[in-house]
Regions:
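Short, contiguous alpha-helical
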Residues: 6-10, 14-17, 27-69, 106-156
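A structural signal for well-ordered alpha-helices, especially hydrophobic packing surfaces
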Residues: 20, 51, 89-96, 128
């Protein structure tokens, strides 16, 4: 069961990276906000920061690891996001494994390791949907392989 839970997390991570990798550079700056809201890059940075917040909250190993953070309001580059996502995905995996070894209990997240993974996957799915809608409404075309491939977890 542990390996299935870790694999579920890693598939979710690969979906987010697949979306990032498919975006044109100008798409990272797309936004629907007229009042300074997050562009696509900032939405992705937010996803990374939430991963880190929970990874550091639930694991002393992660708190001591000096994981890479973005400044509030920063709109990172693709390369910065790719590097950051690799680190935060590993941090979450560390929390999963440590929680599993502790009968599913995690410091700082009272519901335990399985609800933590569910929360993170739901959070990232929400933001991926928001990003796809932003891209569609700002005229950025996404190919069918990306639009439908994000849902084919058997191939990711």
């Amino acid at each position: 069961m542990l390996e299935q839970l870790v694999e579920s997390w890693q598939i979710n991570h690969r979906v987010t990276v697949k979306l990032l990798d498919a975006l044109a550079d100008d798409a990272l700056h797309a936004t629907l906000s007229t009042r300074g809201g997050r562009d696509v890059a900032r939405q992705l940075a937010h996803v990374h920061e939430v991963r880190l917040m929970l990874a550091e909250l639930t694991s002393k190993t992660n708190r001591n690891a000096k994981l890479p953070h973005f400044a509030k309001g920063e709109s990172p580059t693709r390369k910065q996001l790719q590097t950051a996502f690799g680190a935060s995905a590993q941090g979450v995996e560390t929390s999963i494994r440590e929680g599993w070894a502790n009968d599913g209990q995690l410091p700082g997240f009272k519901r335990g390791v399985m609800p933590l993974v569910g929360y993170l996957i739901a959070h990232e799915s929400h933001h991926r949907g928001s990003i796809l809608l932003t891209l569609k409404q700002t005229g950025h075309k996404l190919n069918d392989e990306l639009r439908w491939g994000l849902w084919d977890w058997n191939k990711l």
